[in-house]
Amino acid sequence: MAKSETVRNAERLVEVMMKGNDASHDAAHAFRVRDLALSLAHEEALGLSSSPISLEIVELAALLHDIGDYKYLKNPSEEKIVEDFLVKEGIDIDKSSKILDIIKQMGFKEEINGASNGSQSHTLEFGVVQDADRLDAIGAIGIARCFTFGGSRNRVLHDPNIHPRLDLSKHQYMNKDEQTTVNHFHEKLLKLKDLMKTKAGKRRAEKRHKFMEEFLTEFYEEWTGKA
């Protein structure tokens, strides 16, 4: 199916706004999440059970989800870039509201300590977009992204004396300076499999989760000189 002009404009906005980010949160990440979200949507029969509007909501939310990410925010005004873009593109208020709600509520920090994702957690559009973003955070690509982000922040690779933080608060999670790169697996990435919202997301997460577990086993053996 041919891309709409709005989708092409969204892609261009993503390329411009994420150009200065490290490779863990660059335009390629947004495009992978979009492709995953649409794939999950089709697997969940979203395009068959709902109108094409649902797929447009999924695609735009997935593409635009990391614009204005707090980790890369240079100016508070950037938080309104997506909203302004949707207005400029003539997206109706109902559709725009759904897209913005998905983006606002899909982050891991919003779900820490059992916090609710609100009404959006019950929509399939929300589920496939959030699952797609989380799938890109685990598995082989997730491992690569984790170490890329850690390196960009000069984070310690691993320190056996620094243990993963249990029962993280939202504030603690957002304080990236307190993490080591390997501990991020235990504090977030290994939890994502059980937080998937869709059946399709759960199925795909199993393989990626297993790959991370195998990687960490090998990592610890090499770190301690056993391998």
Can you say where each PLM-predicted feature lies in the sequence?
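N-terminal glycine-rich anion-binding loops that anchor highly charged ligand groups
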Residues: 2-11, 53-56
